[in-house]
Regions:
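Transmembrane-helix signature of polytopic, membrane-embedded enzymes
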Residues: 13, 94-116, 135-136
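Signature aromatic-anchored transmembrane alpha helix within multi-pass, membrane-resident enzymes
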Residues: 331-370
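Transmembrane-helix motifs of polytopic, lipid-linked glycan transferases
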Residues: 16, 81-101, 140-144
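Transmembrane-lumen/periplasm boundary regions of multi-pass, lipid-linked membrane glycan transferases
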Residues: 171, 182-307
Length: 527
């Protein structure tokens, strides 16, 4: 007994060391990298909380509010703190899940693969995205689903676990809609392999718990003509366009890269090994994981044939394949110990290399990305510039205001306008909000997203001093608004330097004598 307790303590100690090391490695980029397009946009969810939002449920905004103490703590590190904490917690939960279902050795392999995955450890584990809480709640949901629904004779404990599965699936839904793939997997498994659950009241209670947690999203959408669902339907609808081999290729290669190419190959091998087994030899947990993970990947792969589909949309499903592959590697370890160690070491090395190289690239631009562009499109093809130069832009704008003799006390009557949610959110977070300036995004709702609701809160007056700001990466001429102003004057150009070289430009325009009651191509009527 003492030996067993000692072994568990030692196991927990080493696991804690691994999690801490992983956390320390990620703290540096979390603190020094400026926010990406999506991250800075989700900051607006915390700034203007609601039951739900145009493009996603509310959980990511709530998470930002929680870890910034309702935005009282400022800076990139605190925006991302929730991602660092939840991803670390997910590692612990995953370890004990896999240990309970398979073995301690499989659990170690699972957490090493989780840490080596670019999606789980960077995209959702470093950056603050809706995937961040989604992954955490999906891991928790699986923690309670796997040992309960596979039981041939579920008792009180299994039923309680299944209800908790419904609870955490509901929270995952409040992060991203397609988290309901968990219920699809659980339901299919019950219908095919374990119909005794259909006689258990706990099964239906778990469904009710999930449905209750979905109420905020449906309430908000009911008030807003179900605009979130029509928006996403237009993004992934199968019958609105022709077959697109480019989007299909981009999705599949992106999916492979996001998971780490080394791991992706392992996932395929492990899955094939399970599928070719004879039925009596297949573990029930393996069946459940395959039924849960495969459909989501197949569905989004099908979508990618017709529409641009982002590779991270299938990300949470790969938790199932990490668990399956962990068991496969644990079984292979006794026969091919060196091979297993080398493969996982390669995956870890590749992860560290990408994290370090990516951070250095964003901060220094040591790799030339994209061809030289015209002056007003400088940096257009360098995606790393989304996360660079915005602090310089604020300094440049403050310098411009100082040269113009505009005092900080008069900025409450100043407005910056933009015409797209990006770079509007960057301009808002790094320039407008710190200076007490209102940012208004003008355009149709597909372009401005949540700013449609933010604009109505902030308002725009004809007496406001108005600037239009755009950048060379996303340049849009202010001439689209010319009919509403007596004149539009180029006021200043801010040069963004990286490694002592100009890499993009921020353009400031003075918009004089605003005269429109509504804006062309915009849903707003301000007066």
């Amino acid at each position: 007994m003492e030996t067993s307790i000692s072994a568990r303590r030692r196991e927990t100690y080493y696991l804690s060391i691994l999690v801490l090391l992983n956390l320390l490695i990620k703290i540096i980029p979390a603190a020094i990298l400026e926010l990406g397009n999506d991250e800075v946009y989700y900051w607006t969810y915390a700034l203007f909380p609601d039951w739900s939002h145009f493009d996603h449920p509310p959980m990511v905004g709530l998470l930002i509010q929680l870890f910034t103490f309702n935005l009282h703590l400022h800076g990139e590190f605190f925006i991302r703190l929730g991602a660092l904490i939840l991803s670390s917690a997910s590692i612990f939960i995953l370890f004990y899940l896999v240990k309970r279902v398979y073995s301690s050795r499989a659990a170690w392999f699972a957490v090493i693969m989780f840490i080596s995955s670019f999606y789980f450890n960077i995209i959702s584990g470093l950056f603050m995205l809706p995937d961040t809480p989604q992954v955490f709640f999906v891991v928790l949901a699986l923690y309670f689903l796997l040992p309960s629904v596979t039981s041939p004779n579920p008792g009180r404990k299994e039923i309680s676990n299944f209800i908790l599965f419904g609870f955490f699936t509901g929270l995952a839904f409040l992060s991203k809609y397609h988290s309901l793939f968990l219920w699809a997997g659980a339901g299919l498994y019950i219908l095919i392999k374990n119909r005794i659950w259909l006689k258990k009241p706990g099964f239906y209670l778990s469904i009710i718990v999930t449905l209750i947690l979905m109420i905020p999203v449906f309430y908000w959408n009911y008030k807003n003509n179900f605009i979130s669902f029509t928006f996403h339907e237009n993004r992934v609808g199968l019958f609105h366009s022709h077959i697109n081999p480019v989007s299909f290729s981009q999705f599949n290669f992106g999916e492979m890269f996001y998971q780490n190419p080394v791991l992706f190959v392992l996932f395929i091998i492990a899955t094939i090994r399970i599928l070719i087994k004879k039925k009596p030899d297949i573990n029930q947990a393996d069946i459940l994981l395959l039924i849960t993970g495969i459909p989501l990947i197949v569905i989004f792969t099908l979508f990618s044939l017709f529409h641009t589909t982002l590779p991270h949309w299938t990300g949470p499903a790969f938790i199932c394949f990490i668990i399956i592959t962990a068991e496969y590697l644990a079984n292979m370890y006794n026969l091919k110990r060196k091979a297993v160690i080398r493969i996982l070491s390669l995956a870890l090395i590749l992860f560290v290399a990408v994290l370090v190289t990516g951070t250095l690239q964003i901060e220094t631009g040591f790799i030339s990305i994209g061809k030289n562009q015209k002056y007003d499109h400088t940096g257009k093809n360098d995606f790393t510039l989304d996360m660079y130069g915005w602090k310089q832009a604020r300094e440049g704008f403050e310098d411009y205001l100082s040269r113009e003799g505009i005092s900080k006390g008069s900025l409450k009557n100043t407005v910056i306008i933009s015409d797209n949610w990006f770079p509007a959110a960057h301009i808002d977070y790094y320039i407008a909000y710190p200076l007490g300036i209102r940012l208004i995004a003008l355009g149709n709702i597909e372009r401005i997203h949540k700013y449609y609701w933010i604009d109505r809160r902030r308002g725009l007056k004809k007496t406001d001093r108005i600037f239009y700001i755009t950048d060379s990466r996303n340049f849009h001429s202010p001439d689209q608004f010319r009919s509403c102003f007596s004149s539009i004057i180029p006021a200043d150009t801010i040069v963004i330097n990286r490694n002592k070289k100009p890499v993009k430009y921020i353009y400031i325009y003075k918009m004089n004598d605003f005269s429109c009651d509504s804006i062309p191509n915009s849903p707003h009527v301000f007066f």
